[in-house]
């Protein structure tokens, strides 16, 4: 695979070229650009944003290539950039991005619609055996033979005016998206994997939409393993924290850290004095919120049992057999993926392997969703080998200790009951 790309697409000493672009900093020019770009077949775009000081990431710059026209849009210079988001949502074009999670969220938050025909080159690269998740610079180097400048990686994109060097640096983020997309699409067609990519993108976008419309209190770090009642406390305190952060346009964890939420839930008390005694709660900015936090705990304590959230059980991961089997299957999964020109990181994680084992060992709830490795294209590509591994018909062997992939799968005779 690497030889395929090096031979056809790699020019080792190539550098990025000087870029001509339009700088759009008022709403009239934005509308004119969007009207002209409405007939484009491809819209490749990227954003620059800052997320550490606000409740939601602050959009600072939009870079877009509409067929052969490249523009940099300054959302901080105008009140309304929704014409651009509506342009993305219009049918009839393909939207090309790299690692476009925040780009998708910006569009969804702005107009409540998806961009049309989403193509994420980071995900697509994993389907042809390149690493996942691969940085944009890595894909440019491997597939286009260019090297991106690195001088502006720590730019504060909120500050104005931006220099010509900063703007040109930003424009490079979309300059090669269409070219990389075409290379990946051709290889996907050769491998007959376009449908897999479409399924994965649809699943990925649906999960993002779901997360945007679902309370994310289960993502509080350290809350796994808490009882239903304590999870109810986590949920109530999280709701207060989220509302407070939104009203102050502040990162939620700057209002109250995750570990403090979990410790409050563990103590399971609505006593202000006991809450204040939690190490970390003595900070001045938290003192005025102690009564409110105590009220959150009290609400959770008064909930009927059936209204408390159920713990998300994925099996007892502390079982030594599950831990060892999870490690083994994760290693085996890597062998299967590399043999089929798939990025192991795209197919599944160590946790996905543990979930699969827990399911096969009957350690999950009967109403639990099927493990990720037993769904869709993943089940088709790795299912047969996974089943053979589970039944002792395949094993791992060291085939070449010096190779990039020293392990291989070895078929075994099917064991008999007396063997």
Please identify what each model-predicted range represents.
Residues 9-43, 47:
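N-terminal accessory regions of nucleic-acid-interacting proteins
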Residues 30, 52-54:
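Short N-terminal binding/cap micro-motifs at the start of the first secondary-structure element
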Residues 44, 53, 61-64:
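Non-catalytic, usually N-terminal nucleic-acid engagement modules in DNA/RNA processing proteins
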Residues 54-58, 72-75:
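Short, glycine/acidic-enriched capping/hinge loops at junctions between secondary-structure elements
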Residues 164, 174, 180, 184-419:
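Accessory DNA-binding and partner-docking regions appended to nucleic-acid-acting proteins
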């Amino acid at each position: 695979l690497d030889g395929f790309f090096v031979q056809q697409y790699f020019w080792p000493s190539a550098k990025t070229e000087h870029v001509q672009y339009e700088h759009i900093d008022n709403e009239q020019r934005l509308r004119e650009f969007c009207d002209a770009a409405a007939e484009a077949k491809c819209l490749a775009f990227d954003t620059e944003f800052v997320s550490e000081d606000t409740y939601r990431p602050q959009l600072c710059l939009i870079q877009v290539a509409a067929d052969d026209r490249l523009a940099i849009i300054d959302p901080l210079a105008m009140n309304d950039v929704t014409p651009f988001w509506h342009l993305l949502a219009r049918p009839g074009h393909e939207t090309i991005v790299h690692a476009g999670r925040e780009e998708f969220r910006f569009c969804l938050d702005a107009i409540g619609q998806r961009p049309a025909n989403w193509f994420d080159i980071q995900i697509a690269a994993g389907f042809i055996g390149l690493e996942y998740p691969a940085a944009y610079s890595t894909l440019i180097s491997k597939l286009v033979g260019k090297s991106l400048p690195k001088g502006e990686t720590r730019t504060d994109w909120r500050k104005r005016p931006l220099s010509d060097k900063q703007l040109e640096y930003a424009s490079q983020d979309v300059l090669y998206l269409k070219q990389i997309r075409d290379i990946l699409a051709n290889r996907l067609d050769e491998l007959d994997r376009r449908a897999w990519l479409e399924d994965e993108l649809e699943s990925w976008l649906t999960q993002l939409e779901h997360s945007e419309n679902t309370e994310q209190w289960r993502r509080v770090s350290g809350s796994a393993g808490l009882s239903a009642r304590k999870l109810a406390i986590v949920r109530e305190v999280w709701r207060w924290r989220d509302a407070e952060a939104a009203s102050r346009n502040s990162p939620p964890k700057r209002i109250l850290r995750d570990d403090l939420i979990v410790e409050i839930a563990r103590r399971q008390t609505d006593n202000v004095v006991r809450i204040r005694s939690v190490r970390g709660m003595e900070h001045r900015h938290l003192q005025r919120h102690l009564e409110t936090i105590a009220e959150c705990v009290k609400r959770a304590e008064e909930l009927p049992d059936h209204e408390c959230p159920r713990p998300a059980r994925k099996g007892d991961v502390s079982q030594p057999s599950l831990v060892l089997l999870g490690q083994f299957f994760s290693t085996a999964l890597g062998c299967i993926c590399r043999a089929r020109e798939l990025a192991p990181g795209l197919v599944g994680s160590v946790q996905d392997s543990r979930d699969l084992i827990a399911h096969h060992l009957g350690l999950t709830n009967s109403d639990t969703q099927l493990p990720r490795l037993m769904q869709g294209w993943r089940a088709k590509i790795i299912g047969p080998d996974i089943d053979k591994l589970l039944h002792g018909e395949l094993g791992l062997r060291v085939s070449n200790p010096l190779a990039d992939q020293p392990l291989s799968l070895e078929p075994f005779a099917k064991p008999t009951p007396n063997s």
